[in-house]
């Protein structure tokens, strides 16, 4: 939404659960797992590696998207994240994001 309250566009990203489910359903050996935040970015086993990739990877993706959006807009953007699982990844983002 711009300074004149007009909707100018946005982006839709795959959710955490969709990403995690896709890994297990579209590969032969990766298990279906719960979406718990790993303690470290570098996983030591398959489950922690999957969780790290999804959770920390999505946080980095969001930060990167915001940088690109602000570059395109020529200034700062206010971001509101939606979805029930957003609270799992937002604390790991380096950018400030509102959760509605």
Please give the residue ranges for each predicted region.
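Gly/Thr-rich phosphate-binding beta-strand-loop-beta motif of the actin/hexokinase/Hsp70
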Residues: 1-7, 23
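ATP-binding/phosphotransfer module of carbohydrate and carboxylate kinases, centering on a glycine-rich
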Residues: 19-100
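Short hydrophobic/aromatic-enriched beta-strand-loop microsegments
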Residues: 7-12, 96-100
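A short acidic/small-residue loop/turn micro-motif
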Residues: 14-16
């Amino acid at each position: 939404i711009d300074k004149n309250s007009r909707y100018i566009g946005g982006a839709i990203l795959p959710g955490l659960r969709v990403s995690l489910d896709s890994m297990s359903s579209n590969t032969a050996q990766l298990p279906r797992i719960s979406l718990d935040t790993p303690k470290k970015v570098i996983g030591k086993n398959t489950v922690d590696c999957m969780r790290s990739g999804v959770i920390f990877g999505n946080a980095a993706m969001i930060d990167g998207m915001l940088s690109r959006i602000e570059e395109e807009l020529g200034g700062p953007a206010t971001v509101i994240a939606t979805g029930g699982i957003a609270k799992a990844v937002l604390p790991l983002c380096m950018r400030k994001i509102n959760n509605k």
